[in-house]
Amino acid sequence: MKSRIKDCFNASEEEFSDWKWQYRNRITTVEELEKLILLSDTEKRDIKKALEVFPMAISPYYASLIDPDDPECPVRLQAVPQSAELQKSSWELEDPLCEDQDSPSEESCITHRYPDRVLFLISNRCGMYCRHCTRKRRVGNREHDYSEKAIREGIEYIRMHHEVRDVLLSGGDALLVSDERLDWLLGELFSIPHVEIVRLGTRAPVTLPQRITPELCEILGKYPSVWLNTHFNHPKEITPEAKKAMNMLACAGIPLGNQSVLLRRVNDCPVIIKNLCHELLKIKTRPYYLYQCDLSFGLEHFRTSVARGIEIIEMLRGHTSGLAVPTFVVDAPGGGGKIPVGPNYLISSSDTGVTLRNYEGVICVYPEPAEYSSKCQQKCTICDKHPGLKSDTGLARLYDEENDVIALEPEGLERKQRF
């Protein structure tokens, strides 16, 4: 397939290995696509309709991974539009995670949801437009590119909010900016005393591994605490080119993680996920999250049940090393944030002990200590410096002996207003 694509583009090996050539020559039309993979007349018509809603862009490299004769190829399903994208369920939203709601302004690049960290969108460009993208409202849309002014305002927001210790650069793709711009941005962020780490969210190692160059690795490696999370969804994506890219990053001292999305017909299988996680560990990449597919517009055909995700984790836990088991999370709609869900191994608990089961179904009892109080026993004042850790809200409030609270009630309970 690679040779076929090179011939189609009349490209040399040097050109094919150049990330800028790859980006310039992304496949964006049905006419270009049908030269590479088998398309029926119905598929051509459906793709053209889907492109009216969300554009297509496939790097020649990623296209080379597609089985041209298999409509069910897991790479193809992630890259090629389908008519199902035009079907909107009642639950689907343009901004299902309410990121815009947690931004300082409509034009801002910043989403500040969690207390000590922010999402900083720096690009709306990608090596490929994933069909399961949760930011379809922004990605590939020139109207939502980020100006120099917006980027500088984002930096200033972080500088003024001393609680922010962790910055996640994303987009689009955080690596789809120039080396010079990324170097400048990292320099600005690490000049802020309270910024401890910067994370990069990128799918470049998967869809555009040529982007990982010695020059880029030198830039990333010179800063004290840059982390990188990428997005492999299927073992077929872990190619020699991808392995080389990840190894270059690892050799530059960059800690690597992977965030997969659970996708129907792509990877909703415990064997596929297990193989993927094993292959990731072999390239020094920790399987970090397995996401339930978001409720973005036109993604109903990709979504699995949450129960299927839990089932997959159940089939991993104990059957492979803990390093190979990602955390399954639902990024809750309405801005609820990431909620971890998984199998329940705690059967019951009491003052004397807990009853547990293991992955084999073995049931055992673990005794609790005879005398123990959940009230902190430390004779220090460290918690006074972190008021957010005190248990005056949420479920923790019920267990705090200093709070005279036995139940938490939502505001506006109907039965409380009857009399």
UniProtKB/Swiss-Prot annotation:
Q: What does this protein do?
A: Catalyzes the interconversion of L-alpha-lysine and L-beta-lysine. Is involved in the biosynthesis pathway of N6-acetyl-beta-lysine, a compatible solute produced by methanogenic archaea that helps cells to cope with salt stress.
Q: Does the keyword Iron-sulfur apply?
A: yes
Cite the source lineage.
Archaea, Methanobacteriati, Methanobacteriota, Stenosarchaea group, Methanomicrobia
- State the protein's name: L-lysine 2,3-aminomutase
What's a Pfam family this protein contains? LAM_C
Question: Where on this chain does Zn(2+) bind?
Answer: 269, 376, 380, 383
Keyword Cell cycle recorded: no
InterPro entries, per the entry: Aldolase_TIM, LAM_C_dom, Lys_aminomutase/Glu_NH3_mut, Lysine_aminomutase, rSAM
Q: Which family does it belong to?
A: Belongs to the radical SAM superfamily. KamA family.
Q: Which residues carry this modification: N6-(pyridoxal phosphate)lysine?
A: 338
- Keywords assigned: 4Fe-4S, Iron, Iron-sulfur, Isomerase, Metal-binding, Pyridoxal phosphate, S-adenosyl-L-methionine, Zinc
